[in-house]
Structure formats: C-alpha cells, structure tokens
C-alpha cells in the first residue's frame, strides 16, 4: 500500500502541475484553486490522525482537487484502517484526475458542489480534512450567496455576512456530515479571526463544537506560492464545548513545533473579539477584550487618504507641473509613497509644501473645461491627454468636472495604511505632517477632534507630544489592532485604528482625561434621590440647528456637538456643574 501510494502521489504531482498550467492565475483565483503543498498536507494529516481515536476511519475530503489529503492519509495511516473515503470536487478536470488516481485505493470521488444539500447525505465522516476553495465573495453570485446564507441559518441558526468567502460556508455546511465526536480539520485563510465577516465562523467554533486548536502560520512563510494569504489550520471535534475545556492557539513554525503556544479557555472565546490576539499572545485570555479606556477615536477623526482615480495621471512632480505652465492655484501639494519618506516627521518649506527632495503636485481644478481653456490653457492641454481608460474609471466618471478632486484638508498626523515589520519593529508608521500636503489612500489621515483641538490650541508644540505618544504605541498593539496577509503584510482599517488604546495621549494633560470621562461615563443606576437634570439629545439637537450646526435627524450626536453645547451653557445647570459622583451620560 505504501509503495502504491508513493507512486500515485508522484503521478498526482505531475498531473497537478499540468492541470494548474491549463488555467491562468486569474481563473484559478476565481475558482479558489490553490493546491496544498505535499509537505503541508502530510504535516496536517499526521496531526489530525493522532486525534482520531477509533481504528476505523470514515474519511471525507471536500474540494478534494487531485486528492492531496487522501494521499497524505494513505501515507500516514499507521495501524488505522480506512472503512470509507469520499472526495468531492466541482472541477470536472480534477474530479476525473482524483478518480483515476485513487479509486483503486478506496476513494469514491463525487463530482459536484460540496455546498449542495443533495450531493452528499450524512452524517458520514469521522474524519474530515480540507483545503476549501478560497473564493472571495465578489466572485459569488447574489442568488448563490443568498442561498448559502439561508441554509447556514436554517441548519445551524448562524447567519453569515454576505461578505463571507466560500470557505466559510464550506466549514459551516459540513456540520451535517460529521458524525458525533468526528475530527474536522480545515486549512483556511487566517483573516476570519479578525474581520467582521468571520464572526459567524467564530460563533460556530465557540458555541457549537469543541475547538481543539488554531495554528496560524507565520505570514512571512507563505504556505502557497500562488496565494498571498496567511493560512491557519483549524481543528475541532463535533461535540459541544465542555466546561473547563481549553483550546490551543499556536503561531509560526509547524504544527508539531510551533514558535508560540497559548492555552485559551473556551469560555473566553467570544465571536466578536479578534482571535489573532490569542494566537500571538498580544491579549491574554483573562483580560476583557472590550476597550474601556481612552481610544484614538476620542482624539481623532480618521479618514482614508485621497483616491484620485489615477495617481499616475493626476499626481506629477511639482517641477514638471510648473514647466508645463500649470497655475499654482490648480496644484495641491501631496505626499509621495511612504517608502520615499524616511523619517517620522514632514517639515514644510516657506511655501507650505513638504520639504522633501521631490515635491509632488495633485492636479485639482473645479472649473468647467470651457472656462479652464481661458484660465489655464496649459492645464487644459494636459487634461486632453487622458485616455479613455482614465476618463472611464469609476471614480473619475462620477466627478464633475472629472478632474476635480475630493476636497480634503491636510492632516497633522498620518498612518501608513500597509507595511511590514517583525517582532519589535513597527509594521506601520505614524508620521507628523507639518506641511500643507494631503495624502493618497496609501495613508490614513488623522484629524483632531474638538477635544484634542482645544488642547493643541494652547501651544503649537503640543502636536509633537501627541505624535510622541502615538509613536509609543507598541508594535504588538498595532499588529493586534490590524490584520495581516501573506508575506507578512500588515494593514490597518480606520475603524481598527480608532479602537486602539490612547492612554498615552490622555495622560498628556489631566483636562483631556476629564473631558473624555465627561462624554463617556456610563449612566448611573437609578436611586431613591433625584438626579440633576441634563440635556436630552433632542434638546441639544434643537439647540445645534438653531445655531447653524449640521446634525442628523436621529442617532448619536458627535462629541463636538456636545462640546459646543457645554461651552455655550457654561454657568447654567449643565452637566459640567454636577459633582463628579453624580455625572450623567451625555450620549
């Protein structure tokens, strides 16, 4: 059996290479076809078989491809025996290949969609191992997504997000095919631990089954040559979580020799939390993951940088713009790629442009083309060189005129949107911007809230102290707050940045912390004594409108609206005059 399995595996590898070459990378990406390397398949199978306590195995491999995991099963059986083995594959080329290779070894290959409710009836599997298709949601049809979501909700009472990748539905819809206490192992992207659409899978792992282990491979050691994703192995048993049970979270190295290992009580696993923190150990399990102290959102409004629609066309060297004769009032200073900024601070020259070797200009003009021809023929001539690809782009085609950019003020603080960094090296950089330059969407732009603006207004040098406090945020906090992709690429979204702790800023001045508590203290429970009156949201909303402040018809009011109300009513019976022990919530 071993020699036959080795010979079949050698044929499989050659066939896999041939079949992969028949499709372009884009086509394989749309199918989610990323073959499991044989060494990785063997490592996963050895670990999983050891968890299978019964001698007889009923094996199921969803999206079996050419049969990499079945091949690994044959090579690592030991004293166990295969009673039944089923592989499911949608691609007819691979289903035929797997059938030709492995039917003689006991694998029954079913050609079809694994998520189809009628394809396989269950429960059939005591052992399931899979590398499901990594198909992103935008490659799934609307009706297909609606059907998948509905069946997950019907079978498990769990409703996934429409942004979920196909792999998430594979895991959830496999539940009906698992025997009691079956071992189920999945090689899937690590993103589910951190993104919002991974909540459904985390709910399943935390509440419906007994999670055994999640091992996240080091992002710098990409497991697939043709897929820039960070991979994790997720292992669970089909049995309810037991009181006192702990799950193993490990990182880096291999399954048998990880770099880091943590035991996390199942009771501590909440679907809403970022589970990558358990993997890396950034956030111990006994700490409440809900941030209760000051957050960056208390001090900054965070927005993505400008999306021009075509940086190569709309952003040109300032010297080139001046050589062409483009007037200065149609040029806005804009920062280059983060790679070209060596320090953590950008100073300004006498004109307000960033003091860097190559200054870049963003072309921005509100005039219609007929007026522009008269006002600045040189700019009109340059714009006439835009090809149809630029003019027909989504962002450009929605603008009027098409060369007018989004209006954005320079931000005093920037964060690089993506970056790399291991151990204590920060993957992302906070940059102080003393110039008049705006930034592209390679950055996040941090604008001080009214609360922080009041502090900064007292001394122009205070922005340096705020920047220093941001630089003190640890590399671990940045990694724990963001997400990581294959090759060690880290990314931070605005909401993730907003949720990072900001104690370092709050401690710069006692007034800052007091102002935060004034708008964030939870309401006191009612007691026998009456509470001092405070303004209702409707009262503040009415006052704001009467004073020309734009506020929404319903929902939470922005903190700066409350700030403005308090300043206008200083000395009256307002929450500012209530003793600290009797403060009430303002929003």
Swiss-Prot record:
BP term (GO), one: methylation
Catalytic activity, as annotated: a 2'-deoxyadenosine in DNA + S-adenosyl-L-methionine = an N(6)-methyl-2'-deoxyadenosine in DNA + S-adenosyl-L-homocysteine + H(+)
InterPro entries with a match to the protein in the record: DNA_methylase_N6_adenine_CS, E3-bd_dom_sf, Lsr2_DNA-bd, MethylTrfase_TaqI-like_dom, N4_N6_ade-DNA_methylase, SAM-dependent_MTases_sf
Name of the protein in its database record: Type II methyltransferase M.SalI
UniProt keyword list: DNA-binding, Methyltransferase, Restriction system, S-adenosyl-L-methionine, Transferase
Catalytic class of the enzyme: transferase
Catalytic activity, EC: 2.1.1.72
Source organism: Streptomyces albus G
MF terms (GO), sorted A to Z: acyltransferase activity; DNA binding; site-specific DNA-methyltransferase (adenine-specific) activity
Family label: Belongs to the N(4)/N(6)-methyltransferase family.
Function recorded in the entry: A gamma subtype methylase that recognizes the double-stranded sequence 5'-GTCGAC-3', methylates A-5 on both strands, and protects the DNA from cleavage by the SalI endonuclease.
């Amino acid at each position: 059996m071993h020699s036959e399995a080795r010979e079949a595996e050698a044929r499989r590898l050659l066939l896999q290479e041939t079949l992969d070459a028949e499709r372009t990378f884009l086509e394989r990406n749309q199918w989610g076809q990323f073959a499991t390397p044989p060494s990785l398949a063997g490592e996963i199978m050895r670990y999983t078989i050891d968890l299978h306590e019964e001698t007889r195995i009923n094996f199921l491999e969803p999206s079996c491809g050419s049969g990499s995991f079945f091949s690994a099963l044959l090579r690592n059986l030991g004293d166990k025996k295969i009673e039944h083995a089923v592989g499911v594959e949608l691609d007819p080329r691979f289903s035929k290949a797997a059938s030709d290779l492995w039917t003689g070894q006991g694998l029954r290959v079913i050609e079809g969609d694994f998520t189809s409710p009628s394809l396989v009836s269950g429960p059939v599997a005591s052992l399931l191992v899979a590398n499901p298709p990594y198909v992103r949601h935008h490659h799934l049809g609307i009706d297909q997504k609606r059907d998948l979501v509905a069946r997950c909700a019907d079978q498990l009472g769990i409703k996934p997000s429409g942004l979920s990748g196909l792999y998430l539905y594979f895991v959830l819809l496999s539940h009906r095919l698992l025997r009691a206490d079956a071992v189920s192992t999945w090689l899937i992207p690590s993103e589910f631990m951190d993104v919002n659409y991974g909540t459904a899978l985390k709910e399943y792992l935390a509440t419906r089954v007994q999670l055994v282990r999640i091992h996240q491979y080091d992002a710098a050691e990409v497991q697939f040559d043709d897929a820039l994703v960070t991979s994790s192995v997720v292992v669970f048993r089909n049995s309810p979580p037991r009181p006192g049970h702990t799950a193993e979270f490990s990182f880096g190295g291999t399954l048998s020799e990880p770099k880091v290992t943590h035991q996390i009580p199942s009771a501590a696993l909440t679907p809403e939390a970022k589970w990558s923190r358990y993997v890396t150990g950034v956030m111990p399990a006994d700490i409440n993951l809900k941030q209760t102290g000051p957050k960056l959102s208390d001090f900054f409004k965070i927005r993505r940088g400008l999306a021009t629609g075509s940086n190569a066309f709309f952003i040109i060297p300032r010297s080139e713009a001046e050589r062409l004769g483009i007037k200065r009032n149609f040029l806005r200073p804009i920062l280059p790629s983060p790679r070209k900024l060596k320090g953590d601070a950008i100073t300004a020259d006498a004109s307000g442009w960033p003091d860097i070797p190559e200054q870049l200009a963003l072309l921005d003009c509100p005039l219609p083309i007929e007026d522009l021809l008269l006002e600045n023929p040189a700019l009109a001539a340059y714009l006439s060189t835009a090809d149809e690809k630029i003019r027909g782009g989504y962002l450009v085609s929605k603008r009027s005129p098409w060369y007018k950019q989004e209006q954005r003020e320079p931000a005093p603080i920037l964060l690089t949107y993506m970056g790399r960094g291991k151990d204590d090296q920060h993957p992302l950089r906070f940059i102080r911007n003393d110039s008049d330059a705006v930034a592209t969407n390679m950055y996040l732009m941090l604008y001080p809230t009214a609360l922080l603006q009041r502090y900064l207004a007292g001394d122009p040098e205070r922005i340096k102290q705020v920047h220093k406090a941001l630089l003190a945020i640890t590399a671990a906090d940045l990694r724990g707050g963001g997400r990581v992709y294959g090759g060690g690429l880290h990314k931070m979204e605005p909401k993730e940045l907003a949720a990072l702790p900001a104690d370092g800023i709050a401690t710069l001045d006692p007034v800052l912390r007091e102002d935060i508590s004034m708008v964030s203290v939870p309401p006191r429970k009612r007691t026998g004594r009456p509470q001092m009156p405070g303004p209702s949201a409707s009262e503040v909303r009415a006052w704001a409108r009467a004073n020309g402040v734009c506020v929404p018809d319903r929902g939470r009011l922005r903190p700066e609206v409350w700030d403005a109300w308090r300043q206008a009513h200083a000395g009256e019976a307002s929450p500012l005059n209530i003793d600290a022990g009797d403060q009430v919530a303002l929003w």
